[in-house]
Amino acid sequence: MHHDDFSLRALHDALDERRRERNLSWTAVAAEVNRLRTKLRPIAVSTITSLRHKPVGEGDGILQMLLWLGKTPESFVPGMADADSAPYRLPTLATGQILRWNTRALFDALNAERASRQLTWTGLAREIEGFTPNMLTNLSRGGRTGFPHVMRIVRWLGHPAVTFTRIARW
């Protein structure tokens, strides 16, 4: 892990602190994180509790945990100034909505910035550690991404993470 990566351990610790403050079990935390869910598979208790030791976490699930905490992705990146200020805040959702990463928008921004800097995909992969050129170009297909890697892309682009999210039906 890079010293300036999104910290899954810090996220786990924040979830655990809120859980203890509210005297909740991990099962109750998972139920609250999943509170807006209608028919898709819920985020499992083990997905939340395993963040303490995992090197990588599923991106959309972590967004739901951040929403429950009322925190931004940037607030778990060391050294991010004003990480909880308005430009970084995640939206408020209604029942049946889920916040997802918009990996196609992430690809489009990445490709545009790559071209403006006259970088090849190989050169870009060298600048954003932990990625191969194929991993970066595969973002164009949409689909899932994970933490902490996605935040390396977001930081390289210099835009708030929320810029690359979308509200979908849950």
Predicted regions and their residues:
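N-terminal positioning helix adjacent to the helix-turn-helix/winged-helix DNA-binding module
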Residues: S7, L11, A44-T47, G61, ...
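Short, basic interhelical loop/turn and adjoining N-cap
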Residues: S25, N34-T47, E129-N138, A161
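Short, basic-rich loop-to-helix N-cap that marks the start of a DNA-contacting helix
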Residues: P42, S46, S50-L67, G142-R155
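Short C-terminal boundary/hinge segments that cap the last helix of small helical domains
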Residues: L63, L67-P87, G158-W170
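Conserved hydrophobic/aromatic packing and binding residues within compact polymer-binding modules
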Residues: V29-A30, V45-L51, F76, L124-A125, ...
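Residue-level detection of the helix-turn-helix DNA-binding "recognition helix"
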Residues: N34, H53, A81, E129, ...
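A short, Lys/Arg-rich alpha-helix, primarily the initiator
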Residues: M1-E32, L36, A83-Q118, G123, ...
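Residues within the alpha-helical elements of helix-turn-helix
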Residues: E32, W68, E127-I128
